Amino acid sequence: MADERIVSAENDDFAEASIEKTLRPQVLAQYIGQDRVKNELAVYIEAAKKREESLDHVLLYGPPGLGKTTLAMVIANELQVQIRTTSGPAIERPGDLVALLNELQPGDVLFIDEIHRLPKMVEELLYSAMEDFYIDIVVGQGPTAHPVHFPLPPFTLIGATTRAGLLSAPLRDRFGIVEHMAYYTEADLMDIVQRSAGVFNMSIVPDGALEIARRSRGTPRIANRLLKRTRDYAQVADQNTIDQAIADHALSQLQVDIRGLDGVDRKILQMMIDYYQGGPVGLKTIAANIGEENETIEEVYEPYLLQIGFLKRTQRGRMVTPAGYAHLGMPYPEK
C-alpha cells in the first residue's frame, strides 16, 4: 500500500528517478532550502579547496525525499571532482567495496545511500579506508591466506541515511561533517515548484505553486510529483496555466488534503478515534487495523503525523492530538 501513495517520499520508480535528474541543481547557489546546511558546507568546501585537501567525510541524515542524493552531487560539483554512487544494500561483499575504492582518483567523492544497511564486514573495512586511506584484505584460504595492504588516494565518503540511529558508533564517529536535513518550508517548496515548472515548460502562478507546496508534506520529491499530476489535470481541462483553482481540484481528486494527508493518513487517525477514543494505541494494534507491517507504520506513515502534531507518542502508545481531531472536524474529548 505504501508504495502506491502519491504522497510517499520514497522513490522506487525508474521514470521518476530519471525526471528527478533533470530537475537537480548543479551548485549550492541553485539548491533551494536547507540554508543552514548549505552555509556550513560552503565554508567546509571552500576551506578544503584552499588547503588543496579532500573534504572531510560527510553524513547526511533525515527523512526520505529531502535531497540528500542531490546535495551529494552538488558537493562533488563544487569540489570539481568525480562522484561514484552506490547504496548500502548493493555492496554485499568486501570485494564490492574494494572495487569501488579502486576506481577513485585523489579527491573524488564516494556516495553511499542507505549507508545504515551496509553489511557488518563491509562496514568494518570502511574504518581504515575513511581514517587512514588504506584497506587490508585477506587473500587466499587456509594456510595460504595472507593479508594484502591496499593504499588508497584521499577521498570523501558521503553517506546518506533516513535512520541515523541504526549507524554503529564507530562508523558514525568517522564522519567529520554531520548534517541533518529538515523538512522544507512552504516558501522553499513554492520556489522548488516554480523552478520545476520552468524546467517542464509549464506556466504556473504563485497561488498555484503555493497550493501544491502546502500539500507536499515538506518534501521536494512529493512537490514535484504533485506538480506533474496537477499538470495532467490542467492539460485535460485545456488550461494553459496552473492556478490555485486547478491545483486544488487536481489534488482534491487525488485525495491529498490541505495538510498533505492522504486517505491512509486520515484512516489511521479516524480508526484511533472511532475504536480507541484517540488512544493511547500500540503500534501493533495500529498496524493490524490498517493491514500494514509495524515497520511500515513507524517509518512511512507515522513520521509526518508526528511532525505536524497530529499524533504524539507516549509510554503507553500513540495518541491523536487536539490538532488531529480538529483536522478531521471532530471535537476533542475531555479526558
From Swiss-Prot:
Domain remarks: Has 3 domains, the large (RuvB-L) and small ATPase (RuvB-S) domains and the C-terminal head (RuvB-H) domain. The head domain binds DNA, while the ATPase domains jointly bind ATP, ADP or are empty depending on the state of the subunit in the translocation cycle. During a single DNA translocation step the structure of each domain remains the same, but their relative positions change.
Q: Provide the function of this protein.
A: The RuvA-RuvB-RuvC complex processes Holliday junction (HJ) DNA during genetic recombination and DNA repair, while the RuvA-RuvB complex plays an important role in the rescue of blocked DNA replication forks via replication fork reversal (RFR). RuvA specifically binds to HJ cruciform DNA, conferring on it an open structure. The RuvB hexamer acts as an ATP-dependent pump, pulling dsDNA into and through the RuvAB complex. RuvB forms 2 homohexamers on either side of HJ DNA bound by 1 or 2 RuvA tetramers; 4 subunits per hexamer contact DNA at a time.
One matching Pfam family is: AAA_lid_4
**Matching Gene3D superfamilies, A to Z?**
1.10.8.60, P-loop containing nucleotide triphosphate hydrolases, Winged helix-like DNA-binding domain superfamily/Winged helix DNA-binding domain
Q: According to the UniProt record, what class of enzyme is this?
A: hydrolase
Compartments annotated for it: namely: Cytoplasm
| Sequence positions that bind Mg(2+) | 69
Q: Write the record's keywords in alphabetical order, separated by commas.
A: ATP-binding, Cytoplasm, DNA damage, DNA recombination, DNA repair, DNA-binding, Hydrolase, Nucleotide-binding
Which gene is the coding source of this polypeptide chain? Answer: ruvB
Name any GO cellular component annotation. cytoplasm
Describe the protein's quaternary organization and the partners it interacts with: Homohexamer. Forms an RuvA(8)-RuvB(12)-Holliday junction (HJ) complex. HJ DNA is sandwiched between 2 RuvA tetramers; dsDNA enters through RuvA and exits via RuvB. An RuvB hexamer assembles on each DNA strand where it exits the tetramer. Each RuvB hexamer is contacted by two RuvA subunits (via domain III) on 2 adjacent RuvB subunits; this complex drives branch migration. In the full resolvosome a probable DNA-RuvA(4)-RuvB(12)-RuvC(2) complex forms which resolves the HJ.
To which protein family does this belong?
A: Belongs to the RuvB family.
> Could you state one GO biological process linked to this protein?
DNA recombination
Q: Where is this region: Head domain (RuvB-H)?
A: 258-335
- Report which reactions are catalysed by this protein: ATP + H2O = ADP + phosphate + H(+)
Q: Mind telling me which InterPro entries this protein's record contains?
A: AAA+_ATPase, AAA_lid_4, DNA_helicase_Holl-junc_RuvB, P-loop_NTPase, RuvB-like_N, RuvB_C, WH-like_DNA-bd_sf, WH_DNA-bd_sf
Q: Provide the protein name.
A: Holliday junction branch migration complex subunit RuvB
Q: Where is this region: Large ATPase domain (RuvB-L)?
A: 2-184
Q: Where is this region: Small ATPAse domain (RuvB-S)?
A: 185-255
Q: Which residues bind DNA?
A: 313, 318
